Regions:
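Cofactor-/ligand-binding subdomain signature composed of acidic, glycine-rich
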Residues: 1-40, 161-199
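Glycine-rich phosphate-binding loops that contact phosphosugars or nucleotide phosphates
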Residues: 38-187
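Short gly/ser/thr-rich secondary-structure transition/capping motifs
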Residues: 24-29, 71-77, 117-118, 197-200
Length: 201
């Protein structure tokens, strides 16, 4: 676990930097179009465990900035909620392994109701990645420890970047503000390295 904590700055760099064009988030290489963000009138975040907690943090950022409803559902309960989901709903599905059974079942339900699914996963070729409409691959590398560290950090970064791109696309912020959001995110890496460097203290 300690090893994986020390790997967090590199994992964040590997996840963030390839998706910056200048100082703005750009998902062209991921095949995630801006139209996806323009066409939704609500967001449903679906996940389990630590990934769900990343979703809770994202809701606190997204809802006030985007001014659309954001709901976080634990995947195992999503099927029993009779969810109000349609083609105007963006389903953001989070799973480190991409194989979480409850999350996969919830994603399948959301898609059957018409919602496009954007997954945030760490394992290429996983079932959730294959079955979702769009994929944001994090680059945390293998995570062996039971307690999630670097996978959680890159999930938060992915959600932050998605929120920033959505806000820019929907006119909720301008390029200067979006650029500042990204500078703030990159500053987290520097702060993290400073703290890790003091770990022997």
């Amino acid at each position: 676990m300690l090893k994986e904590i020390h790997e967090q700055p590199e994992a964040l760099r590997n996840t963030i930097l390839p998706r910056l064009s200048g100082n703005l988030p750009d998902f062209t290489a991921d095949g995630i179009p801006d139209e996806l963000f323009l066409n939704c009138n609500q967001i449903r975040i679906i996940a389990c465990g630590t990934a769900m907690h990343a979703g809770i943090v994202a809701k606190a950022l997204m809802e006030p900035l985007l001014r659309i409803p954001v709901t976080v559902s634990i995947a195992s309960e999503f099927r029993y909620e009779d969810p109000l989901v349609d083609e105007k709903t963006l389903a953001i599905v989070i799973s480190q392994s991409g194989e979480t059974i409850d999350t996969l079942a919830a994603m399948r339900l959301a898609r059957s109701l018409g919602a496009p699914a954007l997954s945030i996963v760490n394992v290429k070729g996983s079932t959730i990645a294959r079955e979702s409409d769009y994929v944001f691959y994090t680059h945390a590398g293998p995570e062996i420890a039971v307690a999630s560290t670097k996978a959680y950090s890159v999930q938060l970064a992915a959600l932050y970047m998605l929120c920033c791109r959505m806000a820019l696309t929907r006119g909720c912020c301008n390029k200067a503000e979006a650029g500042q959001f990204m500078e703030d995110l990159l500053a987290v890496i520097t702060a993290m390295e400073t703290m890790i460097g003091r770990s022997d203290q």
